[in-house]
From Swiss-Prot:
Source organism of this protein record: Bos taurus (Bovine)
Span of the annotated motif 'HIGH' region: 270-280
Lineage, top ranks: Eukaryota, Metazoa, Chordata, Craniata, Vertebrata
Name used for this protein in its record: Glutamine--tRNA ligase
InterPro entries given in the database record: aa-tRNA-synth_I_CS, Gln-tRNA-synth, Gln-tRNA-synth_Ib_RNA-bd_2, Gln-tRNA-synth_Ib_RNA-bd_N, Gln-tRNA-synth_Ib_RNA-bd_N_1, Gln-tRNA-synth_Ib_RNA-bd_N_2, Gln/Glu-tRNA_Ligase, Glu/Gln-tRNA-synth
Annotated positions binding L-glutamine: D303, Y438
Length: 775
């Protein structure tokens, strides 16, 4: 139908021309509305009143199953459904009863068909509602919430027409109160809401304080905003748009509920061929978090169907990272646990003429329009014999595959279900020489484990049709697959292949190099798991792909470490300072608070002797305007000591370089307060400190338009600076790998696993404040 004809058809339903044009832009909606209007005209003629047109538009815009369109249009045109309330009930009924035939008697009862609500009943219901609120209504008059009266009347008369209820409320209120006065016409003053008491479950909005991003945490339920809040209840899979039903669906769902008891079940299914990265953290939080928020369970299932790329170290590392983020799987499973069942189902698929053995080579299947398989229609018995021959090792790799008979969303035809691989499996050894593919394994493992919500990233959307098709082809329980947007970061690469290239090029040490965004790297750098979880919560779960700035993740890190990392003092570029009038014959013991803002968290003790070390940058012989630290005629305080030092003599070497300072000291309360207090160390430990910056110079190192030479050409030469002879106070002497500290005025640091009894090694996790140049 031409656009002008459709426009005329839609305006004939009572739509404004603007609304009709907007509707035409939505191809799915316009097609369904066109069909509904055409069917209605066959009964009512070309003239359709606006009330009926409104119902038809509501039907077309909200109906998920086009098979029910004619059925519902007939109820609208016959006036059996004549209110919005009835239409909503009808749509809910067909959504909850996806299989034929519809029980019309039950349907009509649920939708109020034939129920007549008289004006007298409406009058009585409104009168009863007004009487319940009469006293308050007389006081507040027209400032009273009339919606409350209409809501109570509607609750008493479910199938009453909403417009009639509103009209009756208006009439009775006017009769009780009389016409509106000038006071009634004044706007009701807004009452400021009382500020709720602070709780642990805060919102995830960013608060900017003094130019810094302060990130607040979220509860699990607050994380699951957006589309996730619309998820189906267990057993109501058929209510999900696009879910495919068969005559067996309802029986299978009943069996599913008998097994699970209506429990929410999710799974996190990584491939054990690499290390998890920040994007996986979102998937872990979503799957485990959604299950936990709904009192459900989450499986950790290793998709170990490609023995060529799997290594034992990856299984261990993945499990460790899940635990590190604070989650405990209900059960750890493996796709290989189900190899026998998967094989039996593959045989059954062939018997049902839904799969066949194919001899096209891998290169023949690549590209956008590969040739159809000449073996697609081979006899069932022949495919059964050949598939058994595949299992027995009678074909070389690439000579035969088992393919499923379906076309996927992206146009890919007949995806491979099994292929030959003569590689021993880490769990099953040489038992198998054929292995199932992801397209075949994923949905069936979900079915076996009775997963209720199969949560995947958007790249798997093209495989949703094969997911539903395969479960239904075998008549097994079919879970719901739901896709969400990936989480990516600027200035990062997370591809396993590209990380291996970085390692091979010597740009990073290994998968856990602190400049990477793998979870093992972030842990080594000192990122707390709570910060990563908070970051994932802040990002939320949406359908759109999300690319975030690293400084937002770092803000989450600061937020956690500020409350959890005890303070210590360290000097990166030491300058010796000798106090010539030190007030004691031996070092003083100074009590330093672990957390200056909360001294109830305890203290640690550091020595303060006649020789201390300060940062070289905290002294200048010729300071520029605004410089507040140590200089001639400008004393400075030493943090936590209660003392102020003043320059007495500068000791220089043969080259003129400052080697040490001689100063005098006085009590801080014995004179004018200095302009600044600096950190220091005395009788310190020598340590190595590694200072990290971004690994790449551009936001999108993989984008050829931004980095024509490829990501390896975009490496930041200053991404790592090693300070081999830094000094740190002795309070950290017993620190263990991954212990975290705030080195005052320097940043947050974590003990690196390279540390040994002879020397500690610290990684700078983040600076105290974000560098404005990075934001």
């Amino acid at each position: 139908m031409a656009a002008l004809d459709s426009l005329s058809l839609f305006t004939g339903l009572g739509l404004s021309e603007q609304k009709a044009r907007e509707t035409l832009k939505n191809t799915v909606l316009s097609a369904q509305l066109r069909e509904a209007a055409t069917q209605a005209q066959q009964t009512l003629g070309s003239s359709i009143d606006k009330a009926t047109g409104t119902l038809l538009y509501g039907l077309a815009s909200r109906l998920r199953d086009p098979r029910r369109l004619s059925f519902l249009v007939s109820y609208i045109t016959s006036r059996k459904i004549h209110t919005e309330t009835q239409l909503s009930a009808a749509l809910e009924y067909v959504r909850s009863h996806p299989l034929d035939p519809i029980n019309t008697e039950d349907f009509e009862q649920e939708c109020g068909v034939g129920v007549v609500v008289t004006p007298e009943q409406i009058e009585e219901a409104v009168e009863a509602a007004i009487n319940r609120h009469r006293a308050k209504l007389l006081v507040e008059r027209y400032h009273f919430s009339m919606g409350l009266l209409m809501g109570e009347a509607r609750a008493a008369l479910k199938w009453a027409d909403g417009k009639m209820i509103k009209h009756e409320v208006d009439m009775q209120v006017l009769h009780l109160l009389g016409p509106k006065t000038e006071t009634d016409l004044e706007k009701k003053p807004k009452v400021a809401k009382a500020r709720p008491e602070e709780t642990d479950q805060r919102t995830a909005k960013d608060v900017v304080e003094n130019g810094e991003v302060v990130v607040q945490t979220l509860s699990l339920m607050e994380q699951l905003r957006g589309e996730a809040l619309k998820f189906h209840k267990p057993g109501e899979n058929y209510k999900t748009p696009g879910y495919v039903t068969t005559p067996h669906t309802m029986d299978l769902l009943k069996q599913h509920l008998d097994i699970t008891g209506g429990q929410v079940r999710t799974r996190f299914p990584p491939e054990p061929n690499g290390i998890l990265h920040i994007g996986h953290a979102k998937a872990i939080n979503f799957n485990f978090g959604y299950a936990k928020a709904n009192n459900g369970i989450c499986f950790l299932r290793f998709d170990d169907t490609n023995p060529e790329k799997e290594e034992a170290k990856f299984f261990t590392a993945i499990y460790d990272m899940v635990a590190w983020l604070g989650y405990t799987p209900y059960k750890v499973t493996y796709a290989s646990d189900y190899f026998d069942q998967l094989y039996a189902w593959a045989v059954e698929l062939i018997r049902r003429d839904q799969a066949y053995v194919c001899h096209q080579r891998g290169e023949e299947l690549k590209g956008h329009n590969p040739l159809p398989s000449p073996w697609r229609d081979r006899p069932i018995e022949e495919s059964l014999l050949l598939f058994e021959a595949m299992r027995k090792g009678k074909f070389a790799e690439g000579e035969a595959t088992l393919r499923m008979k379906l076309v996927m969303e992206d146009g890919k035809m007949d995806p491979v279900a099994y292929r030959v691989k003569y590689t021993p499996h880490h769990r099953t050894g040489d038992t198998w020489c054929i292995y199932p593919t992801y397209d075949y394994t994923h949905c069936l493992c979900d079915s076996i484990e009775h997963i209720t919500h199969s949560l995947c990233t958007k790249e798997f959307q093209a495989r949703r049709s094969s997911y539903f098709w395969l479960c239904n082809a075998l008549d097994v329980y079919c879970p719901v697959q739901w896709e969400y947007g990936r989480l990516n970061l600027h200035y990062a690469v997370v591809s396993k292949r590209k990380i291996l290239q970085l390692v091979a090029a010597g740009a990073v040490r290994d998968w856990d190099d602190p400049r990477l965004f793998t979870l093992t790297a972030l842990r080594r750098r000192g990122f707390p798991p709570e910060a990563i979880n908070n970051f994932c919560a802040r990002v939320g779960v949406t359908v759109a792909q999300t690319t975030m700035e690293p400084h937002l993740l770092e803000a989450c890190v600061r937020d956690v470490l500020n409350d959890t990392a005890p303070r210590a003092m360290a000097v990166l570029e030491p300058l010796q300072v000798v106090i010539t009038n030190f007030p004691a014959t031996k070092a003083l013991d100074i009590q330093v608070p672990n957390f200056p803002a909360d001294e109830t968290k305890g203290f640690h003790q550091v020595p303060f002797g006649s020789t201390v070390f300060i940062e070289r940058m905290d002294f200048k012989e010729e300071p520029e305007p605004g410089y507040k630290r140590l200089a001639w005629g400008q004393p400075v305080g030493l943090r936590h000591t209660g003392y102020v030092i003043e320059l007495q003599h500068v000791v220089k070497g043969p080259s003129g370089c400052v080697e040490s300072l001689k100063v005098t000291c006085r009590r801080a309360d014995a004179g004018e307060k200095p302009k600044a207090f600096i950190h220091w160390v005395s009788q310190p430990l020598t340590c190595e400190i590694r200072l990290y910056e971004r690994l790449f110079q551009h936001k999108n190192p993989e984008d050829p338009a931004e980095v024509p030479g490829g990501f390896l050409s975009d490496l930041n030469p200053a991404s790592l600076q090693v300070v081999e002879a830094a000094l740190v106070d002795c309070s950290v002497a017993l620190a263990k790998p991954f212990d975290k500290f705030q080195f005052e005025r320097l940043g947050y640091f974590s003990v690196d696993p390279d540390s040994n009894q002879g020397q500690l090694v610290f990684n700078r996790t983040v600076t105290l404040k974000e560098d404005p140049g990075k934001v």
